[in-house]
Amino acid sequence: MDSNTVSSFQVDCFLWHVRKRFADQELGDAPFLDRLRRDQKSLRGRGSTLGLDIETATRAGKQIVERILEEESDEALKMTIASVPASRYLTDMTLEEMSRDWFMLMPKQKVAGSLCIRMDQAIMDKNIILKANFSVIFDRLETLILLRAFTEEGAIVGEISPLPSLPGHTDEDVKNAVGVLIGGLEWNDNTVRVSETLQRFAWRSSNEDGRPPLPPKQKRKMARTIESEV
């Protein structure tokens, strides 16, 4: 196993522990808590994949961080912060909409890269909107936190979420996954539109009907794909 992989996991575990202590003091805002929950799942998946104990890794990560801080000057810290581009966190969904449990009568699931696509194929003839919480850098989608499909009545009928064991995805991965979800929902004569925020930063465009550019042939192909997979 590569030593950098192990040490990276150890540092991530310790930094998550610090953030959790911060949240326990009720100091974290909604985006902070969203990332904390997501990263907890990711660390569990990575720990299982690597065969490493999280508690032991956290202690080792603390030693690494303490050693770095001992060598770090205030001036070097200022320069590092200034050179890193800042990302923004955008929210279509409330914390309640993100954390709400939902159930599927006819569940379908597809894994596309590091993203998991889930939808209820029992839903028919509904108007559906896709909402997402994600981070943006350089006016482009950076990281998807969670995307969910809602009916006009507020019911959740679909979802795209990062796989905890496979961190990392691009805006193209997200667009492809959205295409799969749209194709699957439209297969049952649902009308699907995407939030303006997601259109703007994923596709850098905004259509009046709320639909991102997706060729009809690609839509039909994606619909058949998700229908054939469980």
Swiss-Prot record:
Record family assignment: Belongs to the influenza A viruses NS1 family.
GO MF, any single term: protein serine/threonine kinase inhibitor activity
HAMAP family: INFV_NS1
Biological process per Gene Ontology, one example term: symbiont-mediated suppression of host type I interferon-mediated signaling pathway
Renumbered residue ranges of the record's region Disordered: 205-230
Region ranges (RNA-binding and homodimerization): 1-73
Span(s) of short sequence motif Nuclear export signal: 137-146
Domain of life (superkingdom): Viruses
Keyword tags: Eukaryotic host gene expression shutoff by virus, Host cytoplasm, Host gene expression shutoff by virus, Host mRNA suppression by virus, Host nucleus, Host-virus interaction, Inhibition of host innate immune response by virus, Inhibition of host interferon signaling pathway by virus, Inhibition of host PKR by virus, Inhibition of host pre-mRNA processing by virus, Inhibition of host RIG-I by virus, Inhibition of host RLR pathway by virus, Interferon antiviral system evasion, RNA-binding, Ubl conjugation, Viral immunoevasion
Listed Pfam families: Flu_NS1 (PF00600)
Description of how the protein assembles with itself and partners: Homodimer. Interacts with host TRIM25 (via coiled coil); this interaction specifically inhibits TRIM25 multimerization and TRIM25-mediated RIGI CARD ubiquitination. Interacts with human EIF2AK2/PKR, CPSF4, IVNS1ABP and PABPN1.
Protein function: Inhibits post-transcriptional processing of cellular pre-mRNA, by binding and inhibiting two cellular proteins that are required for the 3'-end processing of cellular pre-mRNAs: the 30 kDa cleavage and polyadenylation specificity factor/CPSF4 and the poly(A)-binding protein 2/PABPN1. In turn, unprocessed 3' end pre-mRNAs accumulate in the host nucleus and are no longer exported to the cytoplasm. Cellular protein synthesis is thereby shut off very early after virus infection.
GO cellular component term of the entry, any: host cell cytoplasm
Posttranslational modification: Upon interferon induction, ISGylated via host HERC5; this results in the impairment of NS1 interaction with RNA targets due to its inability to form homodimers and to interact with host EIF2AK2/PKR.
Signal peptide: none
Main location: host cell
Positions occupied by motif Nuclear localization signal: 34-38
Protein name (record): Non-structural protein 1
Subcellular compartments: Host nucleus; Host cytoplasm
Region annotated CPSF4-binding, chain positions: 180-215
Entry's free-text remark on domains: The dsRNA-binding region is required for suppression of RNA silencing.
Region annotated PABPN1-binding, chain positions: 223-230
